[in-house]
Design a protein with these regions (language model features):
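Hydrophobic, well-structured mid-protein blocks that either form specific transmembrane helices
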Residues: 121-164
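Acidic, serine/threonine-rich low-complexity disordered tracts
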Residues: 1-127, 167-262
Length: 262
């Protein structure tokens, strides 16, 4: 029997397969530890972070980029310190995560992190052996469970999980999301606090407040995240309190609504 010829792909279908992104920028007020997120482009997912101090002087900037083609993704960030902050953080911070996205969300395959003049950290996720290889001298292998995230994907994975299973995100619910740490798997403890009304430069949003801590480690950073259902559970606020870093607080707040949403 003869087969029906395949329908030629339309231009719009080809475009849909290409890397998509929306451009965002963040600004952090170090006094209030507040940052802002604003959309700049429909063609690529990019977040730009600027840290300012009194009187609103830029001391650092960072850019986050997200690309997706088919089921493969790339998420990267570059942060560069300047001014006062450069005294404490020399050089740049570069992070790159690559992998696939499936029904469970982000599945990292490679992650790298370079901080200033320090040696680059590189992680490879072997989906067959279920081990992560942290490259170095010596290299270290450790097992990882399903759903493990890296330091870039974890916040966005949280939003995807909330969209997929709202029952896990009712106030009072608690859960663990495994995170690839240095030489081991960390298990941050997530607690759903409550729905709160968040006021941002992008408008007001109902947002789900989630607190994140690492049990048994008083020096580990604490995170608070607010996810907005109106924005498909993307964060409208992320606040980090670093106990081990002298009590520093970084608070990021949405500045402009993104035009492209994961």
């Amino acid at each position: 029997t003869s087969r029906t010829p395949a329908r030629p792909r339309s231009r719009s279908e080809d475009c849909a397969e290409r890397a998509c992104s929306a451009r965002f920028a963040l600004v952090v007020d170090a006094a209030r530890a507040t940052s802002w997120l604003r959309c700049e482009s429909k063609t690529s997912d990019t977040w730009n972070l600027a840290v300012v101090d009194r009187p609103v002087v830029a001391v650092a900037s960072a850019t986050y980029r997200f690309q997706k083609q088919g089921n493969r993704y790339r998420l990267d960030t570059e942060a560069r310190a300047s001014g006062v902050l450069a005294v404490f953080y020399s050089g740049t911070l570069v992070q790159v995560s690559e992998g696939v996205m499936d029904a469970q969300g982000f599945v990292p395959a490679r992650y790298s992190e370079k901080r200033g003049r320090r040696p680059e950290r590189r992680y490879r996720f072997d989906s067959l052996s279920r081990h992560i290889r942290q490259e170095g001298d010596p290299a270290i292998d450790f097992a990882y469970p399903d759903g493990t995230q890296d330091r870039l994907t974890i916040f966005f994975q949280l939003g995807l999980l909330a969209r997929a299973d709202a029952r896990r995100f009712r106030p009072g619910q608690k859960f663990v999301l495994p995170l690839a740490g240095s030489r081991r798997i960390d298990e941050p403890f997530f607690r759903v606090v409550r729905q709160e009304r968040m006021r941002t430069n992008a408008g007001e949003f109902d947002a789900l407040h989630i607190s994140v801590e690492k049990p048994g480690d008083q020096d580990a950073p604490r995170f608070d995240i607010w996810l907005a259902p109106e924005l498909k559970m993307l964060p409208v606020r992320i606040r980090v309190f670093d106990h081990g870093g002298g009590g520093k607080i970084v608070d990021q707040v949405l500045r402009r609504r993104p035009q492209e949403i994961l």
